[in-house]
């Protein structure tokens, strides 16, 4: 029982997205020999291997047959819709659902790079609360997502109701000032 719990905890640590610069995507150098853990005939070794993924070009994505393509698309859809950040779940999940079937291998690599970004940072960059780094802003998937988000934002929210560029959207409540320095319009 203790061995089983230890293996489950090791699996959770390896799969954790809290580890900076880590991903659960199998790296291109998959010909290395990794320890293989068998449980009821299921190979958990290289499948859950994590490695530093500073560049999206490190991924070995196999879209050669329909089964591999289906699995890859399903994983990407799941990762984009189940981030735990409601706004990103909706925006990113819908965009991926609309566009993932038409992506080639480079598009999938760019999408994986975007999916590996932290939620708060990605949201601030998509909504122009902060400037994204050059590596992110040059990503074609990020650019398309950013364009969609800004188009929807401009369509549904008047500019005077938004925070100034580079500023957080929500101003914290201050019991002493009681909102005297609040924006002229909007509920920020």
Swiss-Prot record:
Main location: mitochondrion
Annotated keywords: Chaperone, Mitochondrion, Transit peptide
Compartments where found: Mitochondrion
Pfam families to which the protein is assigned, alphabetical: Sdh5 (PF03937)
UniProt entry tagged with the keyword Chaperone: yes
Cross-referenced InterPro entries: SDH, SDH_sf
Presequence boundaries: 1-21
Gene Ontology cellular-component terms listed: mitochondrion
Entry-linked PANTHER family: PROTEIN EMI5 HOMOLOG, MITOCHONDRIAL, SUCCINATE DEHYDROGENASE ASSEMBLY FACTOR 2, MITOCHONDRIAL
Family membership: Belongs to the SDHAF2 family.
Function as written in the Swiss-Prot or TrEMBL entry: Plays an essential role in the assembly of succinate dehydrogenase (SDH), an enzyme complex (also referred to as respiratory complex II) that is a component of both the tricarboxylic acid (TCA) cycle and the mitochondrial electron transport chain, and which couples the oxidation of succinate to fumarate with the reduction of ubiquinone (coenzyme Q) to ubiquinol. Required for flavinylation (covalent attachment of FAD) of the flavoprotein subunit of the SDH catalytic dimer.
Protein name (Swiss-Prot/TrEMBL): Succinate dehydrogenase assembly factor 2, mitochondrial
Organism of origin: Arabidopsis thaliana
């Amino acid at each position: 029982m203790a061995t089983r719990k230890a293996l489950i905890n090791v699996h959770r640590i390896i799969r954790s997205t809290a580890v900076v610069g880590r991903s659960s995507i199998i790296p291109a150098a998959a010909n290395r020999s990794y320890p293989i853990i068998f449980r009821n005939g299921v190979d958990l070794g290289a499948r859950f291997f994590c490695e530093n993924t500073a560049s999206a070009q490190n991924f070995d994505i196999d879209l050669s047959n329909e089964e591999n393509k289906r699995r890859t698309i399903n994983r990407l859809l799941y990762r984009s819709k189940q981030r735990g950040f409601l706004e990103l779940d909706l925006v990113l999940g819908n965009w991926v659902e609309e566009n993932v079937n038409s992506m080639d291998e480079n598009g999938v690599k760019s999408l994986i790079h975007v999916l590996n970004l932290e939620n708060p940072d990605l949201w601030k960059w998509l909504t122009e609360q902060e400037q994204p780094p050059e590596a992110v802003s040059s990503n074609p998937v990020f650019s398309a997502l950013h364009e969609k988000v800004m188009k929807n934002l401009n369509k549904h929210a008047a500019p005077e109701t938004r925070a100034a560029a580079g500023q957080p959207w929500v101003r914290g409540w201050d019991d002493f000032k009681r909102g005297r320095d609040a924006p002229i319009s909007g509920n920020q």
